Amino acid sequence: MKIRASIRKICEKCRLIRRRRRIMVICCNSKHKQKQG
């Protein structure tokens, strides 16, 4: 899980979701997981 100020999709399978007022990226590739900090 990477924590970044600006997050974006890395591949086509990445999905932007909102959890507990935070924007996150989930993907089948676990290296693409991101959270906005």
Swiss-Prot record:
The keyword Manganese does not apply. Its main location: plastid. Keywords: Chloroplast, Plastid, Ribonucleoprotein, Ribosomal protein. GO terms for cellular component: chloroplast; ribonucleoprotein complex; ribosome. It holds the Pfam family Ribosomal_L36. It is found in: Plastid, Chloroplast. GO terms for molecular function: structural constituent of ribosome. One of its GO terms (biological process) is translation. InterPro entries: Ribosomal_bL36 (IPR000473), Ribosomal_bL36_sp (IPR035977). Belongs to the bacterial ribosomal protein bL36 family. This is Large ribosomal subunit protein bL36c. It comes from Adiantum capillus-veneris (Maidenhair fern).
